[in-house]
């Protein structure tokens, strides 16, 4: 199989040096003055068809003489009947889409307002990125209360940080609690409130606040037993019982004898019994985050050996404050002063959050489809993360964090890799236990959904030979599927608007099926601007969960969709004017063909690329159907010769006018590509494009010959031809010159038919197509597909085994495609690599369940509608 998987397609295609563009002289068809990509371009209107055909002795258009209107003896009988359903998207619907000229004045005013708002939001978000320091987050009443406990180091008996005590007095909520007002979780509110009560009681301040706080705790404490375990803050069972004991000693009137409280005390005792003191004092563990709950077992001098470089204990102000009160450690005080210099009169539940903030902000703008506005900011953020990337251990939420976690490490590995940074998946070995299972950090007792989701997403960008990525994919897939099946896709690290929806999308549409526009549409609906995370208390990431991202994403999606609708109208108009509506043998799918590129190369700057891609796709489908189901073998050979000579007169002897419609559509469109390609690239590309089309038709002819002879090739022989006939290379190479990048030959050869990259695109596309079409093709008499060829070559093999073999080839090739996309050494522009990679991905989407192109009135109809026609609210 190595020959199939790795051999490059032989090709002698070379671009001509810069020469004046010449029109073919075989027939006189002048170029139109407008670009072939303009919305008013008309390459093949009916009157022109008649005129041109008259020039070569043909007196009727395809619209005037259909094959079923020919005399009986001249009527052609199709070799095969594919029997596809008619067009899903009718012309009247496409024509009804808002015209760019309707209500021009009011529409212009609205567009101007929207564009101004978009520009404002972009500037505001750019400022957010540029102002990222150690992390923007909300106050933690719990941690602020612990810092407020610290007595003055001058021995005056006053608080060392009086502003924090004043913050507590000023920030009690109306219900008597302390905590994040935007969300109510009983565990979180009671914990925050109890911490503030203890501090006020210690300083004998705020009697009224204490009374209201006690009433709140008494009223809500028992609610904790009914709250989901995943809403319990980190370290709760360690710190809360210890604080209750302290509250009791201070005389706070609380329901200490509730059965639920006794259960929490028992959990604490069991946990403490499991903690070897030598581990606590000699190893970096998550216990450092909650030392205030372990005061009765900690050796305070020994524990300072585990202090982080910034003076904190696992970035926790509460834990650090507790250590300081026991040790007077100056580095602890330095850390607390540092945090308060940032926030003034309060502290967050952990700080810094610099790596977490940057990675999640980048991920957010990418998933929402607005990352193109922030290329500079993304580069700066990822350079920052890479500066602190630990290839051996991974990373945590902050640069100084001594305990890496799989959540931040997996997110960083995936994003850095896709942006061309050299990062190894070996780092994931740090997050496995003796059984091979993955954990978030050492000593973890629960498996979270978000950390598994990020590890799952990371595993999708696997390179060849990365066993650990495959194992991570298997592990996380099982965990996430189980969570969905049990209706338990909720997390102990985050409270999100629609985490189950995120998980469901990720499982249904993994990386190689998840197209950018579909992901953006889905994430716009799932994104919560008030999402919160759970540490020791609820906390917000203000530069991650931010309403500005969502507003920009919605405005931008609808703006881009409006552009796509205009381009859809152009493609459908071109289809009609070329006479393709009247072809009786082909699938009427111009909208789906446009969708296949708009769903990935969606940005406005790729308009010309999209138009070329969609037109080429349409032509390839027409010619595929022509060679598959309509033309006689003799006529098809004449058609191929006409294309080789670029001369319609070769078809003079052919009575079937539909072949001439096909030729003129191809001829005019590709000549238009040549004209515009000369402008884009500064040299003639028409000869190059013609060679590409010749190669495609040669593959179609071979398949027609096989069909006529009922010949079944070997598996390798089939694949070598079929990866050409799938036409993905043709589609890519007819649109690649319109990405806005100059492509000299030394670059072009890295992505054209001479490259492994395009070979893999074609291979995966052909094979996934076969897995969903071979049965229908077999039922209508076609003998050749990868599945059938493999079974014929291996007669002992079952159909399921043959399919498994084909899927195995696809899986390996997709991993190689990941490498071709992300290869740091590649000279090919990223947008060009994206074009190839997304062509492979859209095939995985189209053929996910069935032949989504032939049968486009089911899942694909919804995808097309959500991408092109339904605006986001």
Curated annotation (Swiss-Prot):
Binding residue positions for Mg(2+) 2: 624, 628
Listed cofactors: Mg(2+)
Compartment list: Plastid, Chloroplast
MF GO annotations: copalyl diphosphate synthase activity; levopimaradiene synthase activity; magnesium ion binding; terpene synthase activity
Any one GO cellular component localisation term in the record: chloroplast
Pathway given in the UniProt record: Terpene metabolism; ginkgolide biosynthesis
Enzyme Commission number(s) from the entry: 4.2.3.32, 5.5.1.12
CDD domains (alphabetical): Terpene_cyclase_plant_C1
Cofactor, free-text remark: Binds 3 Mg(2+) ions per subunit.
Record has Ribonucleoprotein as a keyword: no
Binding site for substrate: 271, 492
Residues that, per the record, bind Mg(2+) 3: 769, 773, 777
Any GO BP annotation: diterpenoid biosynthetic process
UniProt KW Calcium keyword: no
Tissue specificity comment: Expressed in roots.
Entry-linked Pfam families: Terpene_synth, Terpene_synth_C
Catalytic reaction(s) noted: (2E,6E,10E)-geranylgeranyl diphosphate = (+)-copalyl diphosphate; (+)-copalyl diphosphate = abieta-8(14),12-diene + diphosphate
Alphabetized UniProt keyword annotations: Chloroplast, Isomerase, Lyase, Magnesium, Metal-binding, Multifunctional enzyme, Plastid, Transit peptide
Binding residue positions for Mg(2+) 1: 624, 628
Highest taxon of source: Eukaryota
pH profile of the protein: Optimum pH is 7.2.
Motif (DXDD motif): 405-408
Family membership noted in the UniProt record: Belongs to the terpene synthase family. Tpsd subfamily.
Domain text: The Asp-Xaa-Asp-Asp (DXDD) motif is important for the catalytic activity in the class II active site relevant for the cyclization of GGPP. The Asp-Asp-Xaa-Xaa-Asp/Glu (DDXXD/E) motif is important for the catalytic activity in the class I active site, presumably through binding to Mg(2+).
Function: Catalyzes the initial cyclization step in the biosynthesis of ginkgolides, a structurally unique family of diterpenoids that are highly specific platelet-activating-factor receptor antagonists. Bifunctional enzyme that catalyzes two sequential cyclizations of geranylgeranyl diphosphate (GGPP) to levopimaradiene.
Protein name: Bifunctional levopimaradiene synthase, chloroplastic
High-level lineage: Eukaryota, Viridiplantae, Streptophyta, Embryophyta, Tracheophyta
Gene assigned in the entry: LPS
């Amino acid at each position: 199989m190595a020959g199939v998987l790795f051999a490059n397609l032989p090709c002698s295609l070379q671009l001509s040096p810069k020469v004046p563009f010449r029109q073919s002289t075989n027939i006189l068809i002048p170029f139109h003055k407008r670009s072939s990509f303009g919305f008013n371009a008309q390459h093949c209107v009916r009157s022109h068809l008649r005129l041109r055909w008259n020039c070569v002795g043909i007196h009727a258009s395809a619209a005037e003489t259909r094959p079923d209107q020919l005399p009986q003896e001249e009527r052609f009988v199709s070799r095969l009947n594919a029997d596809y359903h008619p067009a899903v998207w009718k012309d009247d619907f496409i024509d009804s889409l808002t015209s760019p000229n309707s209500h021009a004045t009011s529409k212009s005013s609205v567009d101007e307002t929207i564009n101004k708002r978009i520009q404002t939001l972009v500037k505001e978000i750019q400022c957010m990125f540029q102002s990222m320091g150690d992390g923007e987050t909300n106050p933690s009443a719990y941690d602020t209360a612990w810092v407020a406990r610290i007595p003055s180091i001058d021995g005056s008996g006053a608080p060392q940080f009086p502003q924090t005590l004043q913050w507590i007095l000023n920030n009690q909520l109306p219900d008597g609690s302390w905590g994040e007002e935007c969300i109510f979780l009983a565990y979180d509110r009671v914990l925050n409130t109890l911490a503030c009560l203890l501090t006020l009681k210690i300083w004998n301040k705020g009697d009224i606040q204490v009374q209201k706080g006690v009433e709140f705790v008494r009223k809500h404490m028992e609610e904790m037993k009914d709250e989901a375990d995943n809403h319990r803050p980190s370290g709760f069972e360690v710190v809360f019982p210890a604080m209750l004991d302290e509250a009791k000693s201070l005389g706070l009137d609380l329901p200490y004898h509730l059965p639920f409280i006794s259960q929490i005390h028992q959990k604490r005792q069991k946990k403490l019994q499991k903690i070897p003191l030598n581990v606590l004092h000699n190893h970096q563990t998550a216990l450092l985050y909650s030392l205030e709950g372990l005061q009765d077992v900690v050796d305070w001098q020994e524990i300072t050996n585990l202090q982080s470089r910034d003076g904190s204990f696992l970035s926790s102000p509460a834990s650090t404050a507790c250590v300081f009160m026991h040790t007077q450690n100056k580095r602890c005080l330095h850390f607390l002063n540092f945090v308060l210099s940032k926030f003034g009169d309060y502290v967050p539940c952990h700080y810094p959050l610099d790596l977490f903030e940057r990675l999640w902000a980048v991920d957010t703008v990418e998933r929402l489809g607005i990352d193109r506005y922030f290329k500079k900011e993304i580069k700066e953020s990822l350079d920052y993360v890479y500066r602190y990337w630990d290839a051996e251990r991974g990373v945590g939420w902050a640069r100084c964090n001594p305990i890496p976690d799989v959540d931040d490490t997996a997110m960083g590995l995936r994003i850095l890799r896709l942006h061309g940074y050299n990062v190894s998946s070996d780092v994931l070995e740090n997050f496995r236990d003796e059984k091979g299972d993955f954990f978030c950090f050492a000593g973890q007792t629960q498996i979270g959904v978000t950390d598994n989701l990020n590890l799952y997403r990371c595993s999708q960008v696997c390179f060849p030979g990365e066993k650990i990525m495959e194992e991570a994919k298997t592990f996380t897939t099982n965990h996430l599927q189980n969570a969905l099946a049990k209706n338990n896709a909720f997390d102990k690290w985050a409270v999100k608007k629609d985490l189950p929806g995120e998980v469901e999308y990720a499982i249904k549409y993994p990386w190689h099926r998840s197209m950018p526009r579909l992901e953006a549409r889905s994430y716009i609906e799932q994104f919560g601007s008030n999402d919160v995370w759970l540490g020791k208390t609820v906390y917000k990431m203000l530069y991650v969960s931010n309403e500005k991202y969502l507003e920009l994403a919605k405005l931008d999606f609808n703006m881009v969709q409006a552009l796509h609708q205009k381009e859809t109208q152009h493609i459908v108009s071109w289809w009609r004017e070329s006479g393709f509506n009247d072809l009786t043998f082909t699938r009427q799918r111009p909208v789906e063909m446009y969708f296949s590129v708009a769903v990935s190369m969606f940005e406005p700057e790729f308009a010309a690329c999209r138009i070329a891609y969609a037109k080429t796709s349409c032509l390839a489908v027409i010619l595929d159907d022509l060679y598959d189901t309509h033309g006689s073998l003799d006529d098809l050979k004449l058609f191929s010769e006409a294309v080789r000579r670029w001369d319609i007169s070769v078809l003079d002897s052919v009575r079937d006018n539909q072949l001439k419609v096909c030729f003129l559509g191809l001829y005019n469109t590709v000549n238009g590509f040549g004209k515009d390609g000369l402008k884009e690239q500064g040299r003639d590309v028409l000869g190059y494009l013609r060679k590409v089309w010749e190669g495609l038709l040669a593959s179609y002819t071979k398949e027609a010959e096989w069909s006529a002879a009922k010949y079944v090739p070997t598996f390798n022989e089939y694949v070598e031809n079929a990866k050409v006939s799938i036409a993905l290379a043709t589609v890519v190479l007819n649109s690649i010159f319109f990405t806005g990048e100059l492509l000299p030959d030394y670059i072009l050869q890295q992505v054209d038919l001479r490259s492994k990259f395009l070979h893999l695109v074609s291979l995966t596309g052909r094979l996934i197509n076969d897995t969903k079409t071979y049965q229908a093709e077999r039922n209508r008499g076609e003998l050749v597909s990868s599945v059938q060829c493999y079974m014929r070559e291996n007669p002992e093999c079952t159909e399921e085994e043959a399919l498994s073999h084909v899927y195995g080839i696809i899986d390996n090739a997709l991993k190689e495609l990941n490498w071709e996309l992300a290869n740091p050494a590649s000279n090919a522009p990223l947008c060009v690599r994206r074009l190839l990679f997304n062509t492979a991905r859209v095939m995985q989407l189209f053929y996910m369940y069935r032949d989504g192109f032939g049968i486009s009135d089911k899942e694909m109809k919804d995808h097309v509608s959500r991408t092109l026609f339904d605006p986001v609210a």
